[in-house]
């Protein structure tokens, strides 16, 4: 019997089972113990293969692919700390609803806890974060193939969001020529190999039904809060709210067109919050709200009913309102709950939103990150997409810009970490094939610098803007101790990215004014390559501009 040959047949069943659940993208890191899985993936023509040498970046690459494709994406890594590097992407997927499959190779049981090299306790290492965890036995013909494939099917059939961890121990030898070992074991699955359906088909989960009293509530004074959703859903939500005559507070990730722009500015005005107190119902569509003032209002509002609609399970309401948690696809829910044409009931808020935007426009000429956030719409590629980093940049865009309705926007706003942002952007571009504008801060770029290797392989123009304000200037907005702020919070690195771009053979620009920035964009959108645009700005200007605008708008 050939151990290496049967390892590969066992792995081939696992990989083929994944294809029955929509897996097309598979991300592979180098490793020896994962050889059976890697070779099985390489031999399966259903997969699009992606490789990366850094497992943490690999996880975020898969996350980006899953964001766009809306399908589960698989990863293959070797044993040891390579597995632990997938943790951040797994956590993010659990919070934002992407589907990830972690295929982690492992040493066999007799090599665990005995000093063997690269052998750690992998089963259960991700605690409660996976939706489902499977610790497979060592490959053996004593276990029928139908058990293996149905085990995979059960885990993936019940996967609606988050990750599945499949731990796969393999004994040596891992290499060798294929022979007939295990062929009859594999063939007992019969015509499943020619079919395209799972061996075990799980019934779909139940979703929230139509709210029978909707006809009553739609006649009341309501507010629509739009969180993270798809571009198509964003356009539908905007029309739905407009028909109802309800004010729509749109997050940067809502893709609604934010008809009442600069919400995180005007929500700091007492006239706006006073008017919103008249709302009898708040319907929040989508989660992951960004703006600080929006979150403060959301926490303090007390309507008669607060409904949250999202297809991700869980409460999704840190304010713990009395109301309804409705698990449903947003577009489907809107169809079940049609709007009734009514006149807008808010008078003060549209005026404040217009005045807030005019205050922002009055400051747009200076060359800084707040102004870039406002101008970002001017630089979006046609038929393209936007990827927004975390920390200060996403808050500035949320507060100061007005993104077009239905324009795809992606971000990692689940756990909101700055790790893996460039890798995620790479996955977003690969899955869509669209021109992509990505914008991150300097610390975020440093954190994931080796992901520039992934950005060498793009199918359409990708522009990465690195806003270099020399540190974590988000902490300038927080009451951090002045005496310790720079050393322990901002942590300025005093670096530039020209040589990093050159190392990975990426185009690079460092504009000094808006005209040079526009010229750099015009050049970048012409060719299907990656261009790094480093925008060096005064360190505290962005945070100070936001604070000044907040003070100005609060007194309108």
From Swiss-Prot:
Entry's EC annotation: 2.2.1.9
Cofactor binding, per record: Binds 1 thiamine pyrophosphate per subunit.
Top EC category: transferase
GO molecular function: 2-succinyl-5-enolpyruvyl-6-hydroxy-3-cyclohexene-1-carboxylic-acid synthase activity; magnesium ion binding; manganese ion binding; thiamine pyrophosphate binding
Enzymatic reactions: isochorismate + 2-oxoglutarate + H(+) = 5-enolpyruvoyl-6-hydroxy-2-succinyl-cyclohex-3-ene-1-carboxylate + CO2
Gene3D superfamilies in the record: 3.40.50.970, TPP-binding domain
Cofactor(s), by name: Mg(2+); Mn(2+); thiamine diphosphate
Keyword set includes Manganese: yes
Pathway of action: Quinol/quinone metabolism; 1,4-dihydroxy-2-naphthoate biosynthesis; 1,4-dihydroxy-2-naphthoate from chorismate: step 2/7; Quinol/quinone metabolism; menaquinone biosynthesis
Quaternary data: Homodimer.
Entries under HAMAP family matching the protein: MenD (MF_01659)
Family of this protein: Belongs to the TPP enzyme family. MenD subfamily.
PANTHER family: 2-SUCCINYL-5-ENOLPYRUVYL-6-HYDROXY-3-CYCLOHEXENE-1-CARBOXYLATE SYNTHASE, PROTEIN PHYLLO, CHLOROPLASTIC
Protein's recorded name: 2-succinyl-5-enolpyruvyl-6-hydroxy-3-cyclohexene-1-carboxylate synthase
UniProt organism field: Escherichia coli (strain ATCC 8739 / DSM 1576 / NBRC 3972 / NCIMB 8545 / WDCM 00012 / Crooks)
Species classification: Bacteria, Pseudomonadati, Pseudomonadota, Gammaproteobacteria, Enterobacterales
């Amino acid at each position: 019997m050939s151990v290496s040959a049967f390892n590969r047949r066992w792995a081939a069943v696992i990989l083929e089972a994944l294809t029955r659940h929509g897996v097309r993208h598979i991300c592979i890191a180098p490793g020896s113990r994962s050889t059976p899985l890697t070779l099985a993936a390489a031999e399966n023509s259903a997969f699009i293969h992606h490789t990366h040498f850094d497992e943490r970046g690999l996880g975020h690459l898969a996350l980006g692919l899953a964001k766009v494709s809306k399908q589960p994406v698989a990863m293959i890594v070797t044993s040891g700390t390579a597995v632990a590097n997938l943790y951040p992407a797994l956590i993010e997927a659990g919070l934002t609803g992407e589907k990830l499959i972690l295929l982690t190779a492992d040493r066999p049981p007799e090599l665990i806890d005995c000093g063997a090299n690269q052998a750690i306790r992998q089963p259960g290492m991700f605690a409660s974060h996976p939706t489902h965890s499977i610790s497979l036995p060592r490959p053996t013909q004593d276990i029928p193939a139908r058990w293996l494939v149905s085990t995979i099917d059960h885990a993936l059939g019940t996967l609606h969001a988050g990750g599945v961890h499949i731990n796969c121990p393999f004994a040596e030898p891992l290499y060798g020529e294929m022979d007939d070992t295990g062929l009859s074991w594999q063939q007992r699955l019969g015509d499943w190999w020619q079919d395209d359906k799972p061996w075990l088909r799980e019934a779909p989960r139940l979703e929230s039904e139509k709210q029978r009293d909707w006809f009553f509530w739609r006649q009341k004074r309501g507010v629509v809060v739009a969180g993270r959703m798809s571009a198509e859903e964003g356009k539908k939500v905007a029309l739905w709210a407009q028909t109802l005559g309800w004010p729509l507070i749109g997050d940067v990730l809502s893709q609604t067109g934010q008809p009442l722009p600069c919400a995180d500015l005007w929500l700091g005005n007492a006239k706006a919050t006073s008017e919103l107190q008249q709302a009898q119902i708040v319907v929040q569509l989508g989660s992951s709200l960004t703006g600080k003032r929006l979150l403060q209002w959301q926490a303090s509002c007390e309507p008669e009913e607060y409904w949250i609609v999202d297809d991700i399970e869980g409460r999704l309401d840190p304010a713990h309102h009395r109301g309804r948690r409705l698990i449903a696809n947003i577009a489907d829910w809107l169809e079940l709950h049609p709007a009734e044409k009514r006149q807008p009931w808010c008078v003060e808020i549209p005026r404040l939103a217009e005045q807030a935007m005019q205050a922002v426009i009055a400051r747009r000429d200076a060359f800084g990150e707040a102004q870039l956030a406002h101008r970002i719409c001017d630089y979006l590629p046609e038929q393209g997409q936007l990827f927004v980093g975390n920390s200060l940049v996403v808050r500035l865009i949320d507060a100061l810009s007005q993104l077009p309705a239905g324009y795809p926007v992606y971000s990692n706003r689940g756990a909101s970490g700055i790790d893996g942002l460039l890798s995620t952007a790479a996955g977003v571009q690969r899955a869509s094939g669209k021109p992509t504008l990505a914008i991150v801060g300097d610390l975020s770029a440093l954190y994931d610098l080796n992901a520039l290797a992934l950005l060498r392989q793009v199918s359409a123009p990708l522009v990465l803007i690195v806003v270099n304000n020399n540190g974590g200037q988000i902490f300038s907005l927080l009451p951090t101790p002045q005496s310790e702020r720079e050393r322990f919070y901002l942590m300025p690195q005093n670096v530039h990215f020209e040589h990093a771009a050159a190392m990975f053979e990426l185009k690079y620009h460092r504009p000094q004014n808006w005209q040079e920035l526009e010229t750099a964009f015009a050049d970048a959108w012409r060719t299907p390559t990656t261009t790094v645009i480093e925008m060096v700005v005064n360190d505290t200007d962005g945070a100070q501009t936001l604070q000044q605008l907040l003070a100005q708008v609060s007194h309108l």
